[in-house]
């Protein structure tokens, strides 16, 4: 099989990857805009652990951010990872994004500190980063190895985010993304390897 770095075969495919990555990455931006509309803001909440009255926050917390700096930091990382994901794992793109969107919130709801609210897209970012990283380790293929190295280079410090080192940071969301990204990489490594066979020296 002929291979290039991102499995991009033509300009149209690349533009589609940019478009779909933009579609997902822009959701937190819309969420941030809606946060500044008083009649809507009260319904935009994060995850409140074990609070059944606000369990819908599991679905909303990736689009809710504390301030512009928090938003831009997450959106930039998210956009880069989404482009890598779409280029190399297109058949599984939305399945991976959906898992990364929901599972960290469920994890926070189950194990997070009560009487706290967790917000931000970092759980999804961690899911994508560790999914891409582990696939590169599991499948001996130049594209995936290269993308693992990109993740290490850009987000190597992410590993420390899964530990409770900073009280203002939702480490539970990071840990949830790490766990879900790792599990999904294990589950999808076999079908992905069939799409892109291991290369021989």
Task: Tell where the protein language model's regions lie, with residue ranges.
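A detector for small-residue-rich transmembrane helices and their helix-helix packing motifs
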Residues: 2-201
């Amino acid at each position: 099989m002929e291979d290039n770095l991102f499995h991009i075969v033509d300009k149209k495919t690349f533009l589609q990857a940019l478009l779909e990555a933009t579609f997902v990455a822009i959701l937190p931006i819309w969420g941030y805009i809606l946060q500044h509309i008083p009649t809507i803001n009260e319904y935009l909440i994060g995850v409140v652990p074990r609070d059944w009255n606000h369990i819908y926050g599991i679905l909303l917390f990736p689009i809710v951010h504390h301030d512009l700096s928090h938003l831009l930091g997450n959106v930039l990382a998210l956009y880069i990872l989404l482009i890598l994901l779409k280029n190399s794992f297109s058949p599984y793109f939305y399945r991976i994004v959906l898992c990364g969107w929901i599972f960290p919130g469920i994890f926070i709801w189950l194990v997070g500190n009560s009487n706290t609210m967790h917000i931000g897209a970092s759980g999804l970012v961690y899911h994508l980063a560790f999914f891409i990283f582990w696939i590169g380790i599991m499948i001996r293929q130049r594209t995936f190895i290269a993308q693992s190295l990109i993740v290490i280079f850009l987000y190597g410090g992410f590993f420390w985010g899964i530990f409770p080192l900073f009280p203002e940071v939702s480490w539970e969301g990071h840990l949830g993304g790490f766990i879900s990204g790792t599990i999904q990489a294990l589950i999808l490594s076999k079908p992905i390897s069939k799409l892109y066979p291991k290369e021989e020296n």
